[in-house]
From Swiss-Prot:
The keyword Methyltransferase does not apply. It is a multi-pass membrane protein. The chain crosses the membrane at residues 7-27, 28-48, 76-96, 99-119, 132-152, 153-173, 191-211, 235-255. It comes from Haemophilus influenzae (strain ATCC 51907 / DSM 11121 / KW20 / Rd). This is Probable membrane transporter protein HI_0198.
């Protein structure tokens, strides 16, 4: 598939903007996947290429959070294992079953997340009581988070952040940091399976990854410096935008 320099430059910018937003609130796929589909590549290849570029951004943000000691891998290694396994299972299933019913339910889930953050203004302002241990979170919650990202994906960062705030008691910046490390883990599992299926356009993926790394690093810095004032409105806005796009794509308002 031949893609010119001008289009590659646009995709580089798309990767930058999407990963900047994704590092803060999730929802970067709302931007990158339509951009990839508009190049004319098949949907499966667009998803695989998106996982490649997203993995670069997620790794960049994760390394930044690790350097700043916002995340301790010794605390969450068990969680990450189950996120990886859940994502692998979701990626395998998405290639073999009909997801029409799930797609119709998804806008309500994403909208609920946005409304929850909107109407609980003090949620995540500071650390709260931890409701689940890391072990129980890993066993009971992580497989579903990974499965969702591998199976479908939109809003994964917001869902992971919400889980960290409500179940692990994290403040919003800490939740966003842990969500990004989990997101990298789930992306890695999905990428490996798309790689085995040959569904990656490498040139496009690497160009977008370069932009993604820069955008994610900047977004991660914003989380650490302006997290409390920035994350909540970004999560709400991205949740509403994702809901609107999914509703439109499903033809709810086509007459």
């Amino acid at each position: 598939m031949d893609i010119g320099i001008d289009l590659l430059a646009i995709l580089f910018c798309v990767g930058f903007v999407a990963s900047f937003i994704d590092a803060i609130a999730g929802g970067g796929g709302l931007i990158t996947i339509p951009a990839l589909l508009m190049t004319g590549m098949p949907p499966a290849m667009a998803l695989g290429t998106n996982k490649l570029q997203a993995m670069g951004g997620a790794l960049s943000a994760s390394l930044y959070f690790l350097r700043k000691r916002a995340v301790n891998l010794r605390d969450i290694w068990f969680i990450l294992i189950w996120v990886f396994l859940g994502s692998a299972l979701g990626t395998l299933l998405i290639q073999s079953i009909d997801v029409a019913i799930f797609k119709k339910m998804l806008p309500f889930l994403i909208l609920a997340i946005g409304l929850y953050f909107l109407f609980t203004p003090k949620l995540g302002d500071e650390d709260r009581k931890q409701r689940l241990s890391y072990l129980l979170f890993g066993l009971l919650v992580s497989p579903f988070l990974g499965f969702y990202d591998g199976f479908f994906g939109p809003g994964t960062g917001s869902i992971m952040s919400l889980a960290c705030v409500t179940l692990l008691g994290f403040n919003l910046p800490k939740a966003a940091a842990h969500a990004k490390v989990m997101n990298f883990t789930s992306n890695l599992a999905s990428f490996a399976l798309f790689l085995l299926g040959g569904q990656i356009l490498w040139k496009v993926g690497f160009v977008m990854m370069a932009g993604s790394i820069l955008g994610a690093n900047l977004g991660a810095k914003m989380v650490m410096t302006k997290g409390k004032t920035l994350i909540r409105p970004m999560v709400v806005i991205m949740s509403f935008m994702m809901t609107a796009k999914m509703v439109y794509d499903q033809g709810w308002f086509h007459f």
